Each structure stands twice: as C-alpha cells, then as structure tokens.
Amino acid sequence: MNQTYGRLVSRAAIAATAMASALLLIKIFAWWYTGSVSILAALVDSLVDIAASLTNLLVVRYSLQPADDEHTFGHGKAESLAALAQSMFISGSALFLTSIQNLIKPTPMNDPGVGIGVTVIALICTIILVTFQRWVVRKTQSQAVRADMLHYQSDVMMNGAILIALGLSWYGWHRADALFALGIGIYILYSALRMGYEAVQSLLDRALPDAERQEIIDIVTSWPGVSGAHDLRTRQSGPTRFIQIHLEMEDNLPLVQAHFVADQVEQAILRRFPGSDVIIHQDPCSVVPREGRKFELV
C-alpha cells in the first residue's frame, strides 16, 4: 500500500510544482504588461503554490520512511506538518495593502485582454490539476495532498474572480480590479486558517471520522464469538490508521479460541482498512463493569 500511496502522492506534488512554475512565468509577464493588481495577487499565489508543493514532495517522501528505533510509529505525522506549513505559507496581508491602495487610487490597466487570456489558461490548468488531486485524495486520503488541493481550489475561484475583474476593468470600472484582489486576499487567508486547523487536529491525534469508526463497530459487533466491545480508540498518521479496541468474550472461552476470534476480527478490519495498525485486547465478560458493556467511542 505504501508504495502505491507514495507514488500517487509524489506524482500529485510533482504535477502541482510543474504547473505552478509554468504559470508563474506567464503571470510575471502578464502583470508586467498589464499592471493588474489581481494578476499580481495570482502571481504571489503561484509563488506560494511552488513553495507548498515542493514542501509536500519532500515531506511525503520523508513520511514514507519505515519506522525506526526513535520513531516506532513511523514518520506519518510529517504530512500534518506539511499541511500546517502550507497554512503558514498562505497569507493575504500583502494583497490587502496593495488592493486598498489601488481601490483609493485606481490605476488603469494596459491591455486587459492579455490578462484575460493568461487567466483563462491558468483557470483551465488549475481545474485539470484539482481534478487529478481529488482522484489522488480519494485513493490515498493523503492529508498533504488534500491541503494542496484546497489551496488550488481557492486558485480556481481566484482565477474566476480575476476574469470578472479584468472584464469589468476593460469596460472602464477600474476599481473592480482592486475590489476582487481584496476579496481574493480574504479568501486565501480563510483557506490558510482552515488548513492550519485541520493540520493541528491531526497532530493532536483526532479520532477517525464517525463513518469509519461506525464501520469498525459494525465489523466487531457482528462477529461470532464476540459478546461486546468497548474502548475504541483511533487516530491517523499519514497513510496509517491506528485502531485499538477491547473485545468482550465469554469467560469459559479457551485462550487459544479467544486469540483465534480476535485474529479473525483483526483481519476483517484490515481488509476494510488496509495498512492499518490494529491492536485488540480480549476481556472476559465478567471483568467488564455492567455499565461498560456498551460501545464507547473514545
């Protein structure tokens, strides 16, 4: 699984870096030629795209290294650090200052048609990239690629806003460029805060989504020989899910048979969530307090 995961995530990061680099060169020319502050916003964002995607590529390769004596649970948390770094890279503050300045004192653009052409190219390329990233996220659940995808999704909205702003400026409403740049800056800042929150939650070992935990509960409680279960604990580090659970079994069940049942339950969980780290503890029903004989999500 890790080989497929690493290959897909690396390809997503390489594709994002290559596209951002190409668009950066085009946007530099377009900004120099038109003087559009909205294109300047897109240019700054492309610089952030390159830095973020390169960081993703390096961090993902590190996170896929096998566990060692100092990192016995592996290096998957590095992905959350990459997502947190992306949230730090993204900032709309400089755009606020530039857009407010242009809002107060609008500057006519030179040939908005060039800016429109460049923005259409950027929009098409970004939509293609986001579609590929969404496919990779669906296959891998990579937090780093998901953070990168959220960033490029904001780029799609940004490029759409730039198209509208350039079109309005073409017809003489020069303040539209600054207004849309201000809106872009606000949205970029919002995206940064959202990505930072998700990364911090992962670093704090947030439990798996409710739907996945419910699937684990369904697998366990429907298994023959299991009378009940409690203390389900879950988290995720990179591509690896960590699942711990206590099974309740009849007191007179031989230890060998209890181990066999627990092993079957573990294999069933692994079939549903390949590559997971599953720890199962067997408890005799008599040692479980009556109030504890129900499923508890921890």
Swiss-Prot record:
Entry keyword annotation includes Cell inner membrane: yes
Reaction equations catalysed: Zn(2+)(in) + H(+)(out) = Zn(2+)(out) + H(+)(in); Cd(2+)(in) + H(+)(out) = Cd(2+)(out) + H(+)(in); Fe(2+)(in) + H(+)(out) = Fe(2+)(out) + H(+)(in)
Location(s) in or outside the cell: Cell inner membrane
Membrane spanning residue stretches: 24-44, 80-100, 112-132, 154-174, 176-196
InterPro entries found in the cross-reference section: Cation_efflux, Cation_efflux_CTD, Cation_efflux_CTD_sf, Cation_efflux_FieF, Cation_efflux_TMD_sf, CDF_Transporter
Top-rank taxon, per record: Bacteria
Topology of the protein relative to the lipid bilayer: Multi-pass membrane protein
Pfam family of the protein (one): ZT_dimer
Annotated keywords: Cell inner membrane, Cell membrane, Ion transport, Iron, Iron transport, Membrane, Metal-binding, Transmembrane, Transmembrane helix, Transport, Zinc, Zinc transport
Assembly information from the UniProt record: Homodimer.
Similarity comment: Belongs to the cation diffusion facilitator (CDF) transporter (TC 2.A.4) family. FieF subfamily.
Function: Divalent metal cation transporter which exports Zn(2+), Cd(2+) and possibly Fe(2+). May be involved in zinc and iron detoxification by efflux.
Name of this chain's protein: Cation-efflux pump FieF
Lineage: Bacteria, Pseudomonadati, Pseudomonadota, Gammaproteobacteria, Enterobacterales
